[in-house]
Protein backbone atom coordinates (compact mmCIF):
# COMPACT_ATOMS: atom_id res chain seq x y z
CA UNK A 1 0.00 0.00 0.00
CA UNK A 2 1.42 3.36 -1.04
CA UNK A 3 1.00 6.16 1.49
CA UNK A 4 1.26 9.89 0.87
CA UNK A 5 3.36 12.57 2.56
CA UNK A 6 2.05 14.86 5.27
CA UNK A 7 1.49 18.36 3.92
CA UNK A 8 3.58 21.18 5.36
CA UNK A 9 2.06 22.15 8.72
CA UNK A 10 1.12 25.80 8.99
CA UNK A 11 3.04 28.00 11.37
CA UNK A 12 0.25 30.30 12.59
CA UNK A 13 2.62 32.65 14.34
CA UNK A 14 5.00 33.46 11.51
CA UNK A 15 2.30 33.54 8.84
CA UNK A 16 -0.05 35.71 10.85
CA UNK A 17 2.78 38.05 11.76
CA UNK A 18 3.72 38.29 8.10
CA UNK A 19 0.13 39.03 7.07
CA UNK A 20 -0.17 41.67 9.78
CA UNK A 21 2.96 43.44 8.59
CA UNK A 22 2.26 43.24 4.86
CA UNK A 23 -1.17 44.71 4.12
CA UNK A 24 -0.53 45.99 0.58
CA UNK A 25 -1.27 42.72 -1.20
CA UNK A 26 -4.33 41.90 0.90
CA UNK A 27 -5.73 45.39 0.34
CA UNK A 28 -5.20 44.95 -3.40
CA UNK A 29 -7.37 41.81 -3.35
CA UNK A 30 -10.21 43.72 -1.67
CA UNK A 31 -10.02 46.71 -3.99
CA UNK A 32 -9.93 44.67 -7.21
CA UNK A 33 -12.22 41.66 -6.73
CA UNK A 34 -12.86 41.44 -10.50
CA UNK A 35 -9.14 40.83 -10.97
CA UNK A 36 -9.10 38.06 -8.38
CA UNK A 37 -8.51 35.22 -10.85
CA UNK A 38 -6.01 32.47 -10.22
CA UNK A 39 -3.44 33.22 -12.93
CA UNK A 40 -3.55 36.94 -12.22
CA UNK A 41 -3.31 36.37 -8.50
CA UNK A 42 -0.30 34.07 -8.83
CA UNK A 43 1.51 36.53 -11.07
CA UNK A 44 0.76 39.41 -8.70
CA UNK A 45 1.84 37.35 -5.69
CA UNK A 46 5.16 36.57 -7.36
CA UNK A 47 5.73 40.24 -8.14
CA UNK A 48 4.83 41.14 -4.58
CA UNK A 49 7.23 38.55 -3.13
CA UNK A 50 9.98 39.66 -5.52
CA UNK A 51 9.64 43.18 -4.17
CA UNK A 52 9.69 41.94 -0.57
CA UNK A 53 12.86 39.95 -1.32
CA UNK A 54 14.46 43.06 -2.84
CA UNK A 55 13.72 44.87 0.43
CA UNK A 56 15.39 42.12 2.45
CA UNK A 57 12.33 40.21 3.71
CA UNK A 58 13.76 36.79 4.68
CA UNK A 59 10.39 35.01 4.89
CA UNK A 60 9.48 36.02 1.33
CA UNK A 61 12.08 33.57 -0.03
CA UNK A 62 10.29 30.62 1.53
CA UNK A 63 6.84 31.91 0.56
CA UNK A 64 7.97 32.16 -3.06
CA UNK A 65 9.23 28.58 -2.95
CA UNK A 66 5.98 27.43 -1.37
CA UNK A 67 3.97 29.22 -4.05
CA UNK A 68 6.00 27.40 -6.71
CA UNK A 69 5.36 24.12 -4.87
CA UNK A 70 1.60 24.63 -4.60
CA UNK A 71 1.40 25.55 -8.30
CA UNK A 72 3.21 22.33 -9.22
CA UNK A 73 6.34 24.15 -10.42
CA UNK A 74 8.51 21.68 -8.58
CA UNK A 75 11.89 22.38 -10.18
CA UNK A 76 11.60 26.07 -9.30
CA UNK A 77 10.42 25.18 -5.78
CA UNK A 78 13.31 22.77 -5.28
CA UNK A 79 15.86 25.37 -6.37
CA UNK A 80 14.36 27.97 -4.01
CA UNK A 81 14.26 25.60 -1.03
CA UNK A 82 17.82 24.41 -1.70
CA UNK A 83 18.98 28.03 -1.69
CA UNK A 84 17.52 28.84 1.74
CA UNK A 85 17.72 25.51 3.59
CA UNK A 86 20.45 26.71 5.94
CA UNK A 87 18.19 29.53 7.16
CA UNK A 88 14.67 28.05 6.97
CA UNK A 89 13.52 24.80 8.58
CA UNK A 90 10.30 24.76 6.58
CA UNK A 91 12.45 24.60 3.44
CA UNK A 92 14.26 21.59 4.92
CA UNK A 93 10.90 19.90 5.53
CA UNK A 94 9.76 20.53 1.96
CA UNK A 95 13.05 19.24 0.58
CA UNK A 96 12.46 16.03 2.53
CA UNK A 97 9.05 15.61 0.92
CA UNK A 98 10.30 16.47 -2.56
CA UNK A 99 13.29 14.13 -2.55
CA UNK A 100 11.27 11.27 -1.04
CA UNK A 101 8.40 11.63 -3.53
CA UNK A 102 10.54 12.64 -6.51
CA UNK A 103 8.98 16.06 -7.05
CA UNK A 104 11.12 18.26 -9.30
CA UNK A 105 13.97 15.77 -9.07
CA UNK A 106 14.75 12.08 -9.31
CA UNK A 107 13.37 10.35 -6.21
CA UNK A 108 16.03 9.87 -3.53
CA UNK A 109 14.29 8.37 -0.50
CA UNK A 110 17.50 8.21 1.53
CA UNK A 111 18.09 11.92 1.05
CA UNK A 112 14.44 12.66 1.86
CA UNK A 113 14.72 10.65 5.08
CA UNK A 114 17.86 12.58 5.99
CA UNK A 115 16.04 15.90 5.77
CA UNK A 116 13.15 14.60 7.90
CA UNK A 117 15.55 13.30 10.55
CA UNK A 118 17.20 16.72 10.61
CA UNK A 119 13.82 18.24 11.54
CA UNK A 120 13.01 15.60 14.14
CA UNK A 121 16.45 15.77 15.78
CA UNK A 122 16.63 19.57 15.87
CA UNK A 123 16.35 21.44 19.17
CA UNK A 124 15.52 24.71 17.41
CA UNK A 125 12.17 26.18 18.55
CA UNK A 126 11.33 26.99 14.92
CA UNK A 127 11.02 23.26 14.16
CA UNK A 128 8.43 22.51 16.86
CA UNK A 129 5.41 22.81 14.53
CA UNK A 130 7.13 20.49 12.02
CA UNK A 131 8.16 17.60 14.28
CA UNK A 132 4.88 15.64 14.31
CA UNK A 133 4.60 15.80 10.51
CA UNK A 134 8.26 14.82 10.09
CA UNK A 135 7.72 11.84 12.41
CA UNK A 136 4.73 10.74 10.32
CA UNK A 137 6.84 10.92 7.14
CA UNK A 138 9.67 8.96 8.75
CA UNK A 139 7.15 6.35 9.88
CA UNK A 140 5.97 6.12 6.31
CA UNK A 141 9.56 5.51 5.14
CA UNK A 142 10.00 2.65 7.64
CA UNK A 143 6.60 1.19 6.68
CA UNK A 144 7.48 1.28 2.97
CA UNK A 145 11.14 0.35 3.44
CA UNK A 146 12.35 3.28 1.33
CA UNK A 147 15.53 5.10 2.37
CA UNK A 148 15.69 2.94 5.52
CA UNK A 149 15.37 -0.75 6.38
CA UNK A 150 11.70 -1.73 6.51
CA UNK A 151 10.35 -1.97 10.07
CA UNK A 152 6.69 -2.02 11.11
CA UNK A 153 7.80 -1.61 14.73
CA UNK A 154 9.70 1.61 14.01
CA UNK A 155 6.87 2.88 11.80
CA UNK A 156 4.40 2.26 14.64
CA UNK A 157 6.67 4.00 17.18
CA UNK A 158 7.06 7.08 15.01
CA UNK A 159 3.36 7.24 14.14
CA UNK A 160 2.42 7.00 17.82
CA UNK A 161 4.74 9.91 18.54
CA UNK A 162 3.31 11.87 15.60
CA UNK A 163 -0.29 11.12 16.68
CA UNK A 164 0.42 12.43 20.20
CA UNK A 165 -2.54 10.74 21.91
CA UNK A 166 -5.06 12.30 19.53
CA UNK A 167 -3.83 15.88 19.88
CA UNK A 168 -5.61 17.87 17.12
CA UNK A 169 -2.45 19.96 16.68
CA UNK A 170 -0.32 16.86 16.07
CA UNK A 171 -0.34 14.76 12.89
CA UNK A 172 -3.99 13.85 12.26
CA UNK A 173 -2.75 11.88 9.25
CA UNK A 174 -0.70 9.70 11.62
CA UNK A 175 -3.80 9.12 13.76
CA UNK A 176 -5.71 7.94 10.69
CA UNK A 177 -2.86 5.75 9.43
CA UNK A 178 -2.60 4.09 12.85
CA UNK A 179 -6.26 3.14 12.49
CA UNK A 180 -5.47 1.57 9.14
CA UNK A 181 -2.26 -0.02 10.44
CA UNK A 182 -3.96 -1.81 13.34
CA UNK A 183 -6.75 -3.10 11.08
CA UNK A 184 -4.21 -4.54 8.60
CA UNK A 185 -1.44 -5.98 10.79
CA UNK A 186 -1.48 -9.62 11.87
CA UNK A 187 -2.97 -10.26 14.30
CA UNK A 188 -5.42 -7.41 13.80
CA UNK A 189 -6.17 -5.12 16.72
CA UNK A 190 -9.57 -3.73 15.77
CA UNK A 191 -10.18 -2.01 19.10
CA UNK A 192 -7.01 0.06 18.63
CA UNK A 193 -7.98 0.64 15.00
CA UNK A 194 -11.37 1.95 16.07
CA UNK A 195 -9.79 4.16 18.73
CA UNK A 196 -7.40 5.83 16.31
CA UNK A 197 -9.98 6.25 13.56
CA UNK A 198 -12.25 7.86 16.19
CA UNK A 199 -9.49 10.27 17.22
CA UNK A 200 -8.68 11.17 13.61
CA UNK A 201 -12.34 11.54 12.67
CA UNK A 202 -12.89 13.83 15.65
CA UNK A 203 -10.03 15.94 14.32
CA UNK A 204 -11.63 16.20 10.88
CA UNK A 205 -9.97 13.35 8.96
CA UNK A 206 -12.18 12.28 6.06
CA UNK A 207 -10.56 8.88 5.46
CA UNK A 208 -11.15 7.84 9.07
CA UNK A 209 -14.77 9.01 9.00
CA UNK A 210 -15.45 6.50 6.23
CA UNK A 211 -13.48 3.80 8.06
CA UNK A 212 -15.54 4.37 11.22
CA UNK A 213 -18.72 3.93 9.19
CA UNK A 214 -17.47 0.60 7.90
CA UNK A 215 -16.47 -0.57 11.40
CA UNK A 216 -19.87 0.37 12.84
CA UNK A 217 -21.62 -1.33 9.92
CA UNK A 218 -19.93 -4.69 10.48
CA UNK A 219 -19.22 -4.46 14.21
CA UNK A 220 -15.44 -4.36 13.88
CA UNK A 221 -13.74 -3.20 17.07
CA UNK A 222 -17.07 -1.84 18.32
CA UNK A 223 -20.64 -3.06 18.78
CA UNK A 224 -22.53 -3.09 15.48
CA UNK A 225 -24.61 0.08 15.05
CA UNK A 226 -26.25 0.57 11.66
CA UNK A 227 -27.54 4.05 12.47
CA UNK A 228 -24.07 5.27 13.49
CA UNK A 229 -22.59 3.55 10.43
CA UNK A 230 -24.95 5.27 8.01
CA UNK A 231 -24.41 8.64 9.70
CA UNK A 232 -20.62 8.34 9.28
CA UNK A 233 -20.80 6.93 5.76
CA UNK A 234 -23.29 9.48 4.44
CA UNK A 235 -21.41 12.42 5.91
CA UNK A 236 -18.08 11.07 4.61
CA UNK A 237 -19.64 10.45 1.19
CA UNK A 238 -20.98 14.01 1.05
CA UNK A 239 -17.50 15.30 1.87
CA UNK A 240 -16.00 13.36 -1.04
CA UNK A 241 -14.85 10.03 0.44
CA UNK A 242 -15.24 7.71 -2.57
CA UNK A 243 -14.68 4.53 -0.55
CA UNK A 244 -17.55 5.53 1.76
CA UNK A 245 -19.64 6.12 -1.36
CA UNK A 246 -18.81 2.59 -2.55
CA UNK A 247 -19.79 1.08 0.81
CA UNK A 248 -23.13 2.91 0.63
CA UNK A 249 -23.72 1.53 -2.87
CA UNK A 250 -23.20 -1.98 -1.52
CA UNK A 251 -25.54 -1.28 1.41
CA UNK A 252 -28.29 0.05 -0.88
CA UNK A 253 -27.97 -3.03 -3.11
CA UNK A 254 -28.16 -5.47 -0.20
CA UNK A 255 -31.19 -3.63 1.19
CA UNK A 256 -32.80 -3.87 -2.29
CA UNK A 257 -32.96 -0.09 -2.70
CA UNK A 258 -32.16 -0.65 -6.36
CA UNK A 259 -33.24 2.71 -7.78
CA UNK A 260 -31.14 4.51 -5.17
CA UNK A 261 -28.27 2.10 -5.76
CA UNK A 262 -28.33 2.74 -9.51
CA UNK A 263 -28.46 6.53 -9.32
CA UNK A 264 -25.71 6.67 -6.71
CA UNK A 265 -23.42 4.04 -8.24
CA UNK A 266 -23.54 5.39 -11.81
CA UNK A 267 -22.05 8.73 -10.83
CA UNK A 268 -19.17 7.02 -9.03
CA UNK A 269 -18.69 4.37 -11.72
CA UNK A 270 -18.33 7.10 -14.34
CA UNK A 271 -15.35 8.73 -12.64
CA UNK A 272 -12.33 8.76 -14.95
CA UNK A 273 -9.83 6.31 -13.48
CA UNK A 274 -6.79 8.10 -14.93
CA UNK A 275 -7.56 11.73 -14.12
CA UNK A 276 -10.13 11.68 -11.32
CA UNK A 277 -8.29 9.44 -8.83
CA UNK A 278 -5.23 11.75 -8.46
CA UNK A 279 -7.47 14.82 -8.39
CA UNK A 280 -9.77 13.37 -5.70
CA UNK A 281 -6.75 12.22 -3.68
CA UNK A 282 -5.28 15.73 -3.81
CA UNK A 283 -8.53 17.44 -2.79
CA UNK A 284 -9.66 14.98 -0.08
CA UNK A 285 -6.26 13.66 1.13
CA UNK A 286 -7.73 10.14 0.89
CA UNK A 287 -5.43 7.32 -0.22
CA UNK A 288 -5.65 6.57 -3.98
CA UNK A 289 -5.92 2.84 -3.22
CA UNK A 290 -9.20 3.33 -1.35
CA UNK A 291 -10.54 5.78 -3.93
CA UNK A 292 -10.05 3.16 -6.65
CA UNK A 293 -11.59 0.53 -4.37
CA UNK A 294 -14.72 2.65 -3.90
CA UNK A 295 -14.93 3.19 -7.66
CA UNK A 296 -14.51 -0.54 -8.29
CA UNK A 297 -17.28 -1.40 -5.82
CA UNK A 298 -19.66 1.10 -7.40
CA UNK A 299 -18.79 -0.14 -10.91
CA UNK A 300 -19.44 -3.78 -9.98
CA UNK A 301 -22.81 -3.17 -8.36
CA UNK A 302 -23.88 -0.85 -11.16
CA UNK A 303 -22.94 -3.59 -13.63
CA UNK A 304 -24.97 -6.12 -11.66
CA UNK A 305 -28.03 -3.86 -11.73
CA UNK A 306 -27.61 -3.42 -15.49
CA UNK A 307 -27.19 -7.15 -15.99
CA UNK A 308 -30.36 -8.05 -14.08
CA UNK A 309 -32.41 -4.95 -14.85
CA UNK A 310 -32.66 -3.91 -11.21
CA UNK A 311 -33.74 -0.28 -10.90
CA UNK A 312 -32.75 0.31 -14.51
CA UNK A 313 -33.43 -1.11 -17.98
CA UNK A 314 -31.44 -4.29 -18.59
CA UNK A 315 -28.33 -3.64 -20.70
CA UNK A 316 -25.86 -6.52 -20.81
CA UNK A 317 -23.37 -4.73 -23.08
CA UNK A 318 -23.07 -1.84 -20.62
CA UNK A 319 -22.91 -4.34 -17.75
CA UNK A 320 -19.82 -5.94 -19.32
CA UNK A 321 -18.20 -2.52 -19.65
CA UNK A 322 -18.63 -1.75 -15.94
CA UNK A 323 -17.61 -5.26 -14.83
CA UNK A 324 -14.40 -4.77 -16.82
CA UNK A 325 -13.85 -1.39 -15.22
CA UNK A 326 -14.24 -2.90 -11.73
CA UNK A 327 -11.62 -5.53 -12.63
CA UNK A 328 -9.18 -2.87 -13.85
CA UNK A 329 -9.65 -0.70 -10.78
CA UNK A 330 -9.27 -3.43 -8.17
CA UNK A 331 -8.84 -7.02 -9.42
CA UNK A 332 -8.85 -8.50 -5.90
CA UNK A 333 -12.13 -6.85 -4.90
CA UNK A 334 -13.74 -7.69 -8.25
CA UNK A 335 -12.73 -11.33 -7.79
CA UNK A 336 -14.24 -11.40 -4.28
CA UNK A 337 -17.51 -9.87 -5.50
CA UNK A 338 -17.60 -12.25 -8.48
CA UNK A 339 -17.23 -15.18 -6.08
CA UNK A 340 -20.24 -13.89 -4.11
CA UNK A 341 -22.14 -13.55 -7.37
CA UNK A 342 -21.39 -17.17 -8.35
CA UNK A 343 -22.66 -18.36 -4.97
CA UNK A 344 -25.81 -16.24 -5.51
CA UNK A 345 -25.06 -13.98 -2.57
CA UNK A 346 -25.32 -10.90 -4.78
UniProtKB/Swiss-Prot annotation:
Q: Where in the cell is it found?
A: Cytoplasm
Read off the PROSITE patterns from this record.
TPR, TPR_REGION
Sel1-like repeat positions? 92-124, 132-167, 172-205, 206-241, 242-276, 296-331
One GO cellular component term of this record is: cytoplasm
Taxonomic superkingdom:
Eukaryota
- List UniProt keywords, sorted A-Z: Cytoplasm, Repeat, TPR repeat
Q: Which SUPFAM superfamilies match?
A: HCP-like
- The UniProt entry annotates TPR repeats at 58-91
Q: Name one Pfam family in it.
A: Sel1
Q: What does this protein do?
A: May act as an adapter that regulates LRP2 function.
Subunit record text: Interacts with LRP2.
Q: What is this protein called?
A: LRP2-binding protein
- Organism ancestry: Eukaryota, Metazoa, Chordata, Craniata, Vertebrata
Amino acid sequence: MKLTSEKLPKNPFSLSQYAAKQQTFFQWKKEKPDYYRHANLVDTALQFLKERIRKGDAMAYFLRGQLYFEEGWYEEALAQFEEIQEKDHQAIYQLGVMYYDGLGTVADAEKGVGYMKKILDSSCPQTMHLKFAAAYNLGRAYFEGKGVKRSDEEAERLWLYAADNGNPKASVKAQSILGLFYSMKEPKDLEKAFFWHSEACGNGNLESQGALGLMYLYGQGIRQDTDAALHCLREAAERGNVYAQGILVEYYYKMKFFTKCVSFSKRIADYDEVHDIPMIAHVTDCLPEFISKGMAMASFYYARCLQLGLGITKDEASAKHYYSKACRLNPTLADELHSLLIHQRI
